Amino acid sequence: MSEYISPIWDIEIGSYTVQKITRFDVFSSRQAPLDLAEVELPKAGLPTDVDAGTRVRISQGYREKGMWLIFDGEIERMEPRSVTTTIFAQDQGGKLKRTPFSQTFIQIEPRAIFQHGLQKAGIMAYKLSSKPLPPKASFVAGGNCLEVFKRVNAAWGLDWAYYFEPEGEFYWGPWEESPRYLQAELTKLEYGVNILEPTRVEEGGRRGLITTFAMPWIRHSHRVIILDHRHFVDPIEVRVERCHYHHDAQKARLTLEWSRGKK
């Protein structure tokens, strides 16, 4: 499709605006509340002060459509090679992973535990569900914040995702209350139009995988419409479980895993 012919990108590493890359990949998932990015770029021109902890921002888009931020985080480590350097970065979930959280709570609701953990990690922008949940007589937090948050969901029997928007806000709550569920418009992925590789369908049509053109406006937990008569008689609405954004000199792609039938 002509509208997807010329994808563009913008990468900032600290105060340095990247001019050339070999590739970048961004991985984002409902199941792993820590977005990861890899940027491979020429050594030449990379400032010497770029190191672990340096901020990384990645945007992708099209001149005719605009740009979308798909990653905002910090460098975790760097791997120099002969002519290129690969940068590995984590989003703000890295702060939660690095922050120890050990505390005993009495008569506590899960929202309050999340608030304590976020404050310990210095996270001030967040949206937590206000849905009433029964308090536990006691809860012992131990480990880092991400580990504790996972245990909180398990202790209360919740299938609630928690993640950072690339713009910085942390979200925890039911899928149907999330900003991503409440999106204004659903993207259509159609066989013969913008589905690029054979659709993998599993579990009797409950799960699958699609590769399409770069669509940086799609994020995990969004809803999309799939039209593929090879597998489904009618269009189906699915939830995006994982996103892999890829960009190199030859192509820009989005590979997404999807599921349907649960919230």
Where in the sequence are the language-model features?
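Juxtamembrane "anchor/assembly" segments of surface/extracellular structural proteins
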Residues: M1-D49, Q92, E177-K263
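Short beta-strand-centered interaction patches in the first periplasmic/extracellular domains
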Residues: S2, T84-T85, A89-G93, M124-E197
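Short, exposed beta-strand/loop patches in secreted or surface proteins that constitute
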Residues: T22, S28-R30, E76-E79, A161-Y163
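Surface-exposed cap/loop segments at beta↔alpha junctions
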Residues: P42-M124
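Extracytoplasmic/secreted envelope proteins and their assembly/folding machinery
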Residues: D72, R111-Q115, L146-K150, G205, ...
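Short, compositionally biased
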Residues: G73-R81, S138-G142, W175, E237-A249
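Extracytoplasmic/periplasmic, Sec-exported soluble proteins
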Residues: F105-P110, V140-N144, P216
